[in-house]
């Protein structure tokens, strides 16, 4: 049925017990129905919560009572009625209905249970994601994610950053390697962008010396774990006339701001998830790479200097370290060509990772801004400088010193929500096995 002139007057969060006697119109989905014979209770769900519709047969019209009795779970309805204070109902109030309009009837049986009384496996949930997202515990994840992204934008704008949009159709790899999705671009081969890194650095040559981007990146990596996806949202910044220490401070202050904002604006969502977020103190603890290797070995996990952190090493660190912390001074040999080596010890670099317990959520570095050194490093990694011609040209005409980082939005949201599976932080995740819905 169509709405006609009917419109919602209140969401669930807008109604309070003090509104006893007020007339309201509410709209949403039939979450649950309890028919006790002479009285029917309907839990109506909207984006903000649940509203109890209480229908006593002796107090409402006979035809209305019959219509309520016929309702099916997850049908879309509009109720009008009178607010009545009730200590037993959600939010301390109930609505005694005066009319019902059924806007759409849901097919039965349901592929999964939005009340969560019957649990479903992750694949079942993702196959029927539109229903899964109706669960309060699932919608809470994305309310927090939305606030996090909003907070990031506000914070970076306050710090003088300009939002940019870089190409997602690219001619070559950002860092070499094979983690690329090839596509046909007219008569040529192109790829989905795996990182905005090179474009961020090119922007440093334009005079727009503080930029950020929040956008999808695509990586055809082999990993099929609870922490990896093939399409994610990356929060990237780049800034000129700064070094790695400066952008690390920006990153830790951003994390603090986000947590403060989520605590302030997402109290209901956090309560739904059973989460209590402590605001971390700054500066975050810093471990040099060499220290991290020693700590990993002390936990009985073999790791050699010069290796990237394997999963076992991350787990070992997570048992020692709590909260957010940086790993700094990574070996130059295992970092990308654009990472600046330490002038006093070229075997070490000005690169860092931000960790949350055993989870890497961000990587960044001071960048190489000298053209000749950059060409040398590209060659040293077995890559052809000719493949980076348009990138390198920006370094020949006045490139300032610069630094930056990329922060994984989904992994960051895992730290806020306490989720263990990154797929749960994406509306419609893409991994090696899933391309729909």
UniProtKB/Swiss-Prot annotation:
Listed Pfam families: tRNA-synt_2, tRNA_anti-codon
Main location as per UniProt: cytoplasm
SUPFAM superfamilies: Class II aaRS and biotin synthetases, Nucleic acid-binding proteins
GO biological process entries: aspartyl-tRNA aminoacylation
GO cellular component, one term: aminoacyl-tRNA synthetase multienzyme complex
Protein name: Aspartate--tRNA(Asp/Asn) ligase
UniProt: Mg(2+) 2 binding residues: 360, 363
InterPro entries assigned: Aa-tRNA-synt_II, aa-tRNA-synth_II, aa-tRNA-synth_II/BPL/LPL, Asp-tRNA_synthase_2, Asp/Asn-tRNA-synth_IIb, NA-bd_OB-fold, NA-bd_OB_tRNA
Organism whose genome encodes this protein: Methanothermobacter thermautotrophicus (strain ATCC 29096 / DSM 1053 / JCM 10044 / NBRC 100330 / Delta H)
PROSITE patterns hit by this protein: AA_TRNA_LIGASE_II
EC number: 6.1.1.23
Molecular-function GO terms, alphabetical: aspartate-tRNA ligase activity; aspartate-tRNA(Asn) ligase activity; ATP binding; magnesium ion binding; RNA binding
Disulfide bonds: none
Binding locations of L-aspartate: 175, 219, 363, 367
Annotated NCBIfam families: aspS_nondisc, PRK05159.1
Subcellular location as annotated: Cytoplasm
Assembly with partners or alone: Homodimer.
Family: Belongs to the class-II aminoacyl-tRNA synthetase family. Type 2 subfamily.
């Amino acid at each position: 049925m169509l709405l006609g002139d009917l419109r919602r007057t209140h969401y669930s969060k807008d109604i309070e017990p003090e509104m006893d006697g007020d007339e309201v119109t509410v709209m949403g989905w039939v979450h649950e129905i309890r028919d006790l014979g002479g009285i029917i209770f309907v839990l109506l769900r909207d984006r903000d919560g649940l509203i109890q519709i209480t229908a006593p047969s002796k107090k409402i019209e006979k035809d209305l009572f019959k219509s309520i009795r016929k309702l099916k779970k997850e049908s879309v309805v509009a109720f009008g009625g009178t607010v009545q204070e009730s200590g037993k109902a959600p939010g301390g109030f109930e609505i005694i209905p005066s009319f019902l309009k059924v806007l759409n009837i849901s097919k039965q049986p349901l592929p999964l249970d939005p009340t969560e009384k019957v649990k479903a496996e992750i694949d079942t949930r993702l196959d029927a994601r539109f229903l899964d997202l109706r669960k309060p515990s699932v919608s809470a994840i994305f309310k927090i994610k939305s606030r996090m992204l909003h907070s990031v934008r506000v914070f970076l704008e306050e710090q003088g950053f300009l939002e940019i949009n870089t190409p997602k159709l690219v001619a070559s790899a950002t860092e070499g390697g094979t983690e690329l999705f090839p596509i046909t671009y007219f008569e040529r081969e192109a790829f989905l962008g795996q990182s905005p890194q090179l474009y961020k650095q090119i922007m440093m040559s334009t005079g727009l010396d503080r930029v950020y981007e929040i956008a999808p990146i695509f990586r055809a990596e082999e990993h099929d774990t609870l922490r990896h996806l093939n399409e994610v949202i990356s929060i990237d910044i780049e800034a000129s006339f700064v070094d790695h220490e400066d952008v690390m401070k920006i990153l830790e202050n951003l994390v603090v701001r986000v947590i403060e904002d989520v605590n302030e604006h997402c109290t209901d969502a956090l309560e739904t998830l059973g989460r209590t977020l402590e605001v971390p103190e700054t500066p975050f603890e810093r471990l040099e790479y060499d220290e991290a290797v020693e700590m990993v070995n002390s936990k009985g996990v073999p790791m050699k200097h010069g290796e990237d952190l394997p999963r076992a090493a991350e787990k070992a660190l997570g048992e020692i370290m709590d909260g957010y912390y940086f790993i700094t001074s990574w070996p130059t040999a295992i970092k990308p060509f654009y990472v600046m080596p330490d002038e006093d010890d070229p075997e070490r670099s000005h690169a860092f990772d931000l960790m949350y317990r055993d989870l890497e959520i961000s990587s960044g570095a001071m960048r190489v801004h000298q053209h000749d050194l950059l060409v040398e490093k590209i060659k040293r990694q077995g890559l052809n400088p000719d493949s980076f011609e348009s990138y390198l040209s920006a370094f020949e005409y006045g490139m300032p010193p610069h630094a930056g980082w990329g922060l994984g939005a989904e992994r960051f949201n895992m730290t806020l929500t306490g989720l263990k599976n990154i797929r749960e932080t994406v509306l419609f995740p893409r991994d090696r096995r899933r391309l729909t819905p």
